[in-house]
Amino acid sequence: MSEDQYMGNLYQRFPVTVEKGKGAHVWDIDGKEYIDCMGGYGVALVGHQNKRVNDAIKEQVDKIITVHSSLYNKTREEFLKTLIGLAPKGLTQVHLNNSGAEAVEAAIKFARKFTGKKGMVAMKGSYHGKSFGALSLTFNPKYKKAFAPLVEKVSFASYGDIESLKEAIDDDTAFVILEPIQGESGIIVAPDGFLQDVRKLCDEKGILLIFDEIQAGLGRTGRLWACDHWNTAPDILCLAKGIAGGVPMGATLVRPDILASMSKGEHSSTFGGNPISCAAGVAALKSITEDGLIENSEKMGKLFKEGLEKLKENHTMIREIRGKGLMIGVEMKFE
């Protein structure tokens, strides 16, 4: 466990040194097998050592490892076409980056530039990352207090409450950002009708709507996109985690008129669109959409919730079970 002397105290560490993985299982250096319930905090979406992803990475490594986006690359082109072919309606352009926080940072800049406005509205209970802009949109004070003051002109509305959102916006609001299912705050599912109401309100006020599907997207909820449960599309969509099968990647999907407002050089990423990440991304997206992972998430999620509900009948400490697909949370009570 000598990593600690080099990495400081930034992470909650567990006394397991992982050596290898396969599917939903990992093995430590002593050969002990574990079921990986962590999954890299949502990254191992297609499982460890997914054959499609492994083969794609090996093939790409033998061609070229890095190509900056100032040059063209066929692997990147294939990934972009694949991703846009699956994107919510109207989102036909992409900025490729390296993480969820970077995807959110790009969304902030794009929305502010396009609207010419500065105000930002996020939700109470939100989590969007720990870089400065994303942290400003994250609700939990424990992540923010030590770094104040953060980005100004951020307001928070109560999740699921359209009247609270109406009070939070003003004439200088550039965008509203929300997770269709809040992850870090406890798997809080948007009430039916809420996303549609937010979409209507944003359209009426000329405000952009950003969905953060970094955790909820890519089939986890039994739909490719969590927002599909409510037939509502955003103006900007933030993705990361399992998008490249475990290789670092983030993506900010956007309407073309929004991205057209940006001038060359106003935003970029040195490693965004890396060919290895893109090769892995094509493979991961094909695995999600062609190997039955979305359907499996819906089917197994129903079975899992049914089993949890039976447990709840006999265990009063279980307060509530909520979620969609295999994105499930169990709230406990200890009174």
Roles of regions detected by a PLM:
Residues 1-335:
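Conserved N-terminal phosphate-binding loop of PLP-dependent enzymes in the Aspartate aminotransferase
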